[in-house]
């Protein structure tokens, strides 16, 4: 070892014998290293976690004393302790040290609304899990990332935590620290009524909903109600909103001044339920439940990285070993005290209908119904109460909606509230005036007259088919842009649809899968109208009252199903054959449908038949089966996988016809005609034919109807138009058979010999084409008495909320018919359907496939019947027929010129059909009588010339 050398200027004396002191040097170095490690492991985190000792005293001097801050404030003790000073409008929240980093739930509800644009009282607007975390002199409001998880003790936990970020929404200043309890005090106004912080995100969605930006005004915002309970805290804040630019504000008829309005928002804070005996239940795609899903990084065995739990209530038997037992804690629904007295019983019956299904799962009286007292002190938005609320709106957004709130870690349902729109009854009680508003609202959405209208249900039945047209070449249409109403030109219609479906409200309701769409309201109105037209029932008759109660009962049972965790099942309406639908001996023992979770239309018997129940009075066999899967008590400990054998045994019945399941995503591409909304029976094609005839009968009855009262002609107009919409729906249901396939969510062991996909029988596809020819494309498909059309006068009131119809003033019958025909033709010959027809030839035996040549040739013969199937009569092509033929011509030309992305075989066939048509046109022109009308001659000659130019032109490429 080298000697230690010191300079002469060093004040330290040299060590004469370094080896002698080597052990001392080693001891000093070891002690220093030990103290450094001890400081890092123990004292440093403690120092960083908050001020202590002198630093703490200094900070306490910087902050106001705790008692001074809460002086004169009312103390509310509960899960969190609150201090409310009504004089200063301050509310403080006290956070205990053990509550930091603990997980809590926040449920946010719109307690008051605007009555339009989806801003409705009772709407859920936010549910999330959060933590409160202290960092220096602030408290962070943190949304942890629970989408990625590991098992307890897994060393991968740190890696997962570093890989995926959490969301720190806000950092709130600490106002004071209690000197003994070491609790932190924050101003709750910094979180809930701040101009800068918008916890529920209302401010961000207002531009989408209202078409203008609004800011939160702190001077107009305040706390309304503040309550603390041992397990939850309930707070209601009133937000004052003002427009950011008064010149850009859209007119809101439900608000006195569109530049400013208030919204009351209710917050429910509660602890995340832990160790309460609840066992999550694994999901199965054959049974329809809402899901709670996460990715498990600790599971290296399963093929599927996701763990999926169904959302369900925590039901336990009082007597665990008994085959039938009441639950320890039943599911209780409270009917809000503002529900009209005459409808409370129908709502009660709708809720209790589910007890039949729970009985098959081993529970008696699993669901109970109570009436909210008129003098109740609790708020319907309180997380401790499940309520059924009566929602009033200026413009109806839905008939009903049934959201539920869950524990996002386990899927346990903790709270549910159902909203029923009061307009569902006014449609009958006020002589269909609400249908007038629906039609105006629909027209506004199509014409773009109200940019703020983003109702996702506004397109009703059209939304399912508009997406089919999105990839089509609509710019090459017939150029007959219709100027009003639902007969707007197709390119504009599709553009509006694309804008609407991107709105925040649309995404909310689509993702929640809970909106019983506005089309349900139209179905209800059609049923009431059919009673008036087919059975001469008056709005005050007992028959109509029974009908209203049947509808409310069915609407309620559907929404309660959502709150139990069930998703839609659009296969649910196919259980009975059309001939059995009105056999009450059958429907009142088995049910009218297999599942009340379908969007079921009114059951209208064909003319001359006995009318049965309009809506199902029972939950169906699928509903019983789904509740059994979700709620049957199964042994196996607390590990969810212990239930798998029993659950798979239940789900293996999926191959049974009555248990077929099709949620929203199975209806997206219009593959399966049985997976459909507002269809009925196991033979929808025949049922649609019945309803088309019912529609024609109602039109005939309108011709003979004598209008009465001040609104007589307007009522006649609305009824006529509503029947038109009903007719349209039946036609569109028919199109689903062409190129269709049935799809079943089955596994190989569920149904021997049955495959997931089965092409629709060739005979049914041909019958569908024949039905479209008869009711849409035939020259005599639409025929109305001129006297009836001249009675269809609109209401002429002009004031807020009731703008007078300006254009077109007379009923646009030509636009209505033209729009229907063009729409059906575009959907029938869409690129997606043509591609499916091409592929169907590979999926069927040659003799069982509906081939592209047959479809294109059949449609062309139907549309150009006067040319290709001439008679001895003088040729006269009506204006409707000419418009339809121009649309068909435009579609074929688009294919030939590669303006649409159709299969190459379809393009070649379109070229061939144009040549055939040109030959027919030339022959017809030669044989035209000299006295033929000029319209027909000009139409035929122009069409022939257009075809020649296309066939002779150089093919253009995209």
Regions found by a protein language model. Give the residues of each.
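N-terminal secretory signal peptides that target proteins for export/translocation
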Residues: 1-21
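Bacterial N-terminal signal peptides
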Residues: 28-41
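Signal peptide processing junction and immediate N-terminal pro/mature segment
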Residues: 41-53
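Auxiliary tRNA-acceptor-end handling modules of aminoacyl-tRNA synthetases
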Residues: 50-339, 357, 361, 366, ...
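Soluble non-cytosolic domains of exported or imported proteins
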Residues: 123, 304, 337, 341-349, ...
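The catalytic-center signature of Zn2+-dependent metalloproteases
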Residues: 360, 370-393, 397, 550-606
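Conserved catalytic/binding loops enriched for acidic/polar residues
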Residues: 488-503, 509-519, 525-526, 530-531, ...
């Amino acid at each position: 070892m080298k000697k230690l050398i010191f300079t002469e200027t060093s004040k330290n004396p040299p060590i004469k014998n370094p080896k002698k002191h080597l052990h001392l040097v080693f001891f000093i170095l070891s002690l220093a290293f030990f103290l450094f490690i001890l400081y890092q492991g123990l004292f440093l985190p403690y120092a960083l976690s908050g001020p202590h000792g002198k630093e703490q005293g200094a900070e306490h001097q910087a902050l106001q004393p705790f008692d001074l801050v809460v002086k004169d404030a009312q103390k509310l003790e509960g899960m969190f302790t609150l201090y409310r000073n009504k004089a200063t409008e301050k509310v403080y929240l006290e956070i205990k040290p053990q509550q930091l980093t603990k997980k809590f739930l926040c449920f946010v509800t719109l307690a008051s609304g605007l009555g339009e644009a989806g801003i409705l009282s009772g709407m859920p607007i936010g549910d999330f899990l959060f933590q409160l975390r202290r960092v220096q002199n602030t408290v962070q409001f943190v949304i942890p990332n629970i989408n990625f998880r590991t098992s307890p003790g897994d060393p991968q936990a740190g890696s997962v935590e570093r890989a995926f970020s959490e969301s720190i929404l806000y950092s709130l200043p600490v106002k004071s620290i209690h000197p003994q309890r070491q609790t932190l005090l924050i101003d709750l106004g910094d979180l809930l009524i701040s101009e800068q912080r918008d916890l529920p995100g209302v401010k961000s969605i207002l531009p989408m909903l209202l078409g203008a930006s609004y800011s939160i005004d702190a001077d107009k915002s305040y706390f309304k109600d503040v309550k603390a309970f041992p397990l939850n805290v309930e707070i209601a804040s009133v937000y004052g909103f003002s427009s950011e630019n008064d010149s850009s504000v859209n007119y809101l008829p439900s608000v006195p001044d569109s530049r400013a309005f208030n919204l009351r928002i209710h917050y429910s804070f509660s602890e995340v339920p832990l160790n309460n005996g609840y066992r999550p239940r694994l999901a199965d795609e054959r049974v329809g439940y809402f899901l709670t899903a996460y990715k498990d990084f600790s599971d290296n065995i399963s093929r599927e990285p996701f763990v999926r739990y169904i959302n369900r209530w925590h039901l336990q038997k009082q007597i665990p070993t008994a085959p039938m037992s009441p639950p320890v804690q039943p599911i209780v629904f409270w009917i809000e005290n503002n529900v009209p007295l005459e409808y409370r019983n129908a709502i009660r019956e709708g809720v209790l209908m589910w007890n039949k299904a729970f009985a098959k799962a081993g529970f008696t009286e699993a669901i109970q119904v109570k009436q909210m007292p008129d003098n109740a002190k609790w708020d319907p938005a309180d997380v401790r109460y499940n309520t059924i609320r009566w929602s009033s709106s200026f413009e109806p957004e839905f008939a009903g909606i049934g959201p539920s709130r869950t524990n996002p870690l386990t899927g346990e349902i903790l709270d549910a509230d159902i909203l029923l729109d009061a307009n569902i009854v006014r449609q009958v009680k006020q002589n269909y005036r609400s249908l007038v508003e629906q039609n105006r609202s629909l027209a506004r959405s199509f014409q773009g007259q109200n940019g703020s209208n983003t109702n996702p249900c506004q397109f009703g039945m059209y939304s399912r088919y508009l997406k089919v047209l999105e990839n089509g070449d609509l710019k090459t249409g017939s150029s007959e842009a219709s100027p009003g109403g639902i007969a707007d030109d197709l390119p504009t219609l599709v553009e509006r649809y694309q804008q609407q479906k991107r709105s925040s409200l649309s995404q909310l309701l689509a993702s929640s899968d809970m909106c019983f769409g506005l089309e349900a309201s139209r179905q209800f109105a059609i049923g009431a109208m059919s009673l008036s037209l087919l059975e001469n029932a008056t709005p005050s008759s007992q028959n109509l009252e029974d009908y209203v109660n049947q509808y409310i009962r069915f609407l309620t049972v559907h929404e309660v199903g959502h709150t139990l965790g069930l998703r839609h099942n659009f296969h649910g309406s196919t259980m009975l054959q059309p001939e059995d639908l009105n056999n009450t001996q059958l429907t009142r023992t088995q049910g009218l449908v297999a599942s009340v979770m379908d969007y079921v239309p009114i059951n209208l018997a064909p003319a001359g038949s006995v009318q049965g129940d309009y809506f199902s009075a029972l939950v169906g066999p699928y509903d019983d089966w789904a509740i059994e899967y979700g709620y049957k008590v199964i042994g196996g400990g607390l590990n969810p996988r212990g239930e798998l054998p029993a659950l798979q045994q239940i789900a293996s019945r999926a191959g049974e016809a009555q248990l077929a399941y099709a949620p929203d995503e199975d209806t997206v591409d219009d593959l399966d005609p049985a997976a459909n909304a507002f269809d009925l029976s196991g033979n929808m094609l025949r049922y649609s034919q019945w309803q088309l005839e019912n529609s024609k009968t109602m039109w005939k009855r309108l011709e003979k109807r004598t209008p009465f009262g001040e609104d007589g002609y307007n009522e006649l107009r609305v009824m006529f138009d509503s029947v038109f919409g009903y007719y349209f729906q039946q036609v569109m249901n028919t199109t689903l058979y062409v190129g269709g396939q049935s799809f079943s969510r089955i596994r190989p062991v569920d149904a021997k010999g049955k495959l997931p996909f089965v092409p629709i029988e060739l005979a049914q596809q041909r019958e569908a084409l024949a039905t479209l020819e008869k009711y849409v494309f035939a020259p005599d498909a639409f025929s109305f008495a001129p006297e009836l059309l001249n009675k269809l006068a609109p209401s002429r009131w002009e004031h807020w909320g009731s703008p007078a119809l300006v254009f077109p003033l007379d009923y646009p019958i030509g636009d209505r018919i033209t729009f229907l025909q063009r729409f059906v033709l575009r959907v029938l010959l869409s690129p997606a359907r043509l591609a499916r027809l091409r592929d169907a030839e590979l999926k069927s035996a040659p003799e069982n496939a509906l081939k592209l040549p047959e479809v294109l040739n059949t449609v062309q013969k139907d549309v150009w019947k006067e040319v290709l199937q001439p008679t001895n009569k003088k040729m006269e092509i009506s204006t409707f027929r000419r418009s339809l033929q121009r649309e068909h011509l435009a579609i074929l030309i688009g294919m030939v010129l590669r303006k649409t992305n159709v299969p190459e075989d379809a393009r070649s066939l379109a070229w061939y059909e144009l040549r055939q048509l040109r030959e027919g046109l030339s022959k017809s022109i030669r044989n035209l009588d000299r006295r033929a009308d000029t319209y027909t001659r000009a139409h035929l000659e122009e069409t022939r010339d257009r075809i020649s130019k296309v066939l002779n032109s150089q093919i253009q490429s995209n």
